[in-house]
């Protein structure tokens, strides 16, 4: 959980800085974390955030 909190902090900073490439990478990492935890709701939420940032990064 400590690693998740670190990723989340980095994700929030990348959003603040409008660094969508970094935000998408972190969202994908967080998505994989929740998938490994077996939490489908969080996995789905982070998959959507990942896709949003990928689209904005282009």
State the predicted function of each range.
Residues 20-58:
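Short, charge-rich amphipathic interface segments used for partner binding and complex assembly
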